[in-house]
Structure formats: structure tokens, C-alpha cells
């Protein structure tokens, strides 16, 4: 006997007031931002970084990073937008690339810390864990938009029904790569919280290095499962960038361990 399996797909629109639509995608990003900022302001005093400095940085970096993430995505997906230029501005439909946001945010952070006479690595060490938790939450925006998913699989019975149903796309269950990356970032955040409380364990800049290696490794593996990777000359751009992050992070640790004058992170 044939049976019809019922599936409940979630509406990507959370609130609709006339022409105004607020999407879950935006809510997830904002929730990640708010929690990340809160955690950074709590940790900042350990490096003598004022709350006002963190808030001022976010007010500048967040909109520019979203813009950078969109430009990055459009640049590598130009064929989707060249015939409808106005769709470039429809960012609420999804289509931002984390690496574009990270690159833009890093540039803004460098100039901001130089202008405020703040040690750049100290600021990075405070911000990096917050970025991880923000990414962990923000990835759920992809869940609601049914994007950034993986290859087709026979079943997802190991997942709760609400995730399983949402990952039924184009007639097949899809690997929930958004979930893999969310959990990976959450685990990385937890490890950082433990490691930075150990006396004389992490040196200045090594929390940043940990983020680069941890996120780079996770993204390198997870990106290989996705079906919507941004490509350039037949290459998955994010995997190459992940390799660069890993290499930079390892070099940072090696160089800093060779210098006894570099201070340890104070728990």
C-alpha cells in the first residue's frame, strides 16, 4: 500500500505586516550578533578593552561586513544576477558569503584598532569567540531559507522531524550542512571558553589562531558536502580559503611560541 508522508516546511517569513516582511534569516543573524556582542563586552575588560570600543566597532563593522558578504557572493554568482541587476539588493532572500563578511570585518578591525590605539591581536582574541557563536546561530538562517544544504541522502532519521522535514528539498532529503557547521562552531566556542581559562596556556593571538584553524578545518570538510558552493575556474573557493586560514593559524602559533616575550592570555 502506498502511503503519503506528511512533511511540515517552515515559512521563511517570521512576521508579515502589510508589505513589511521580517525573515527568520535576518532574525538568526541579529540574534547571533547580539549574543556575540554581549559575550565580547563581558570578556573585553580582561584585555582592557572598553565596552564602548566594542560597540563602536560593531556599529561600523556589521553593516560593512554584510555588504562585503553580499558583494563576495554576487561576484562568484554573477550569472544569477547579470540579467536582473535589481535582485542584487534583495539580500533578505539570502545569498551572503561568510568569507566575504570575515574578510571585510578583518579589514575594518585592523583600521579601527589602529585608529583607537588598541592592540589588534588583543581585540581579535576578544572578538574571535563571539564570531564563532554568531556563526553557530546565524547558520540557522540557511535552515529556514532551505539553502546551503548538502547532497541527497536516503533518510535523515537521526534528526528531529522539524529539521528532517525542512531538509526535504527538490524531492529528496539533503545533508543538513548548516547544522554540521553550526554544531562545529558551537563546539569550537566551548573549547575556547575552557582553554582561555587555563593559566599560562594560550599566548596573545592564539585564540585568533585557534579560530582560524578550527573554522578552517570544519569549513574545508563541510564545504565538500555542499551542492551550492561558490566556484571559480572549477574550484570551490571556500575550500581554498579554508586552507589559507589553517595555514595562517598554524604559522601564527609556531611564530608566537618561539618568542618568550609574548604575554599569555590572562584567565
Curated annotation (Swiss-Prot):
Pathway this chain belongs to: Protein modification; lipoprotein biosynthesis (diacylglyceryl transfer)
Any Pfam family the entry gives: LGT
GO cellular component terms, semicolon-separated: plasma membrane
EC number: 2.5.1.145
Keywords: Cell membrane, Membrane, Transferase, Transmembrane, Transmembrane helix
Membrane-spanning segments: 20-40, 57-77, 88-108, 117-137, 175-195, 205-225, 235-255
Binding residues annotated for a 1,2-diacyl-sn-glycero-3-phospho-(1'-sn-glycerol), in chain numbering: 139
Localization per Swiss-Prot or TrEMBL: Cell membrane
One annotated GO molecular function: phosphatidylglycerol-prolipoprotein diacylglyceryl transferase activity
Biological-process GO terms, alphabetical: lipoprotein biosynthetic process
Primary location group: membrane
Membrane topology of the entry: Multi-pass membrane protein
Enzyme's top EC category: transferase
Record InterPro entries: Lgt
PANTHER family documented for this protein: PHOSPHATIDYLGLYCEROL--PROLIPOPROTEIN DIACYLGLYCERYL TRANSFERASE, PROLIPOPROTEIN DIACYLGLYCERYL TRANSFERASE
Entry's family note: Belongs to the Lgt family.
Role, per record: Catalyzes the transfer of the diacylglyceryl group from phosphatidylglycerol to the sulfhydryl group of the N-terminal cysteine of a prolipoprotein, the first step in the formation of mature lipoproteins.
Protein name: Phosphatidylglycerol--prolipoprotein diacylglyceryl transferase
Organism expressing this protein natively: Streptococcus suis (strain 05ZYH33)
Amino acid at each position: 500500500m502506498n502511503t503519503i508522508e506528511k512533511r511540515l516546511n517552515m515559512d521563511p517569513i517570521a512576521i508579515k505586516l502589510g508589505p513589511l516582511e521580517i525573515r527568520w534569516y535576518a532574525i538568526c543573524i541579529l540574534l547571533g550578533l547580539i549574543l556575540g556582542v554581549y559575550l565580547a563586552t563581558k570578556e573585553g575588560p580582561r584585555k582592557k578593552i572598553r565596552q564602548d570600543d566594542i560597540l563602536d566597532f560593531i556599529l561600523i563593522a556589521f553593516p560593512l561586513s554584510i555588504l562585503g558578504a553580499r558583494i563576495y557572493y554576487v561576484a562568484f554568482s554573477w550569472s544569477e544576477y547579470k540579467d536582473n541587476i535589481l535582485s542584487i539588493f534583495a539580500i533578505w532572500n539570502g545569498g551572503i558569503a561568510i568569507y566575504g563578511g570575515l574578510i571585510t570585518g578583518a579589514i575594518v578591525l585592523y583600521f579601527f584598532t589602529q585608529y583607537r590605539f588598541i592592540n589588534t591581536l588583543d581585540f581579535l582574541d576578544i572578538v574571535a569567540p563571539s564570531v564563532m557563536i554568531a556563526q553557530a546561530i546565524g547558520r540557522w538562517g540557511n535552515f529556514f531559507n532551505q539553502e546551503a544544504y548538502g547532497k541527497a541522502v536516503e533518510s535523515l532519521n537521526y534528526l528531529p522531524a522539524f529539521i528532517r522535514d525542512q531538509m526535504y528539498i527538490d524531492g529528496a532529503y539533503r545533508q543538513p550542512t548548516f547544522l554540521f557547521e553550526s554544531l562545529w562552531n558551537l563546539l569550537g566556542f566551548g573549547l575556547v571558553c575552557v582553554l582561555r581559562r587555563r593559566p599560562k596556556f594560550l599566548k596573545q593571538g592564539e585564540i585568533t589562531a585557534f579560530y582560524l584553524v578550527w573554522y578552517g578545518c570544519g569549513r574545508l570538510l563541510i564545504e565538500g558536502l555542499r551542492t551550492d558552493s561558490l566556484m571559480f575556474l572549477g574550484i570551490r573557493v571556500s575550500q581554498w580559503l579554508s586552507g589559507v586560514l589553517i595555514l595562517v593559524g598554524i604559522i601564527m602559533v609556531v611564530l608566537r611560541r618561539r618568542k618568550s616575550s609574548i604575554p599569555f592570555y590572562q584567565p
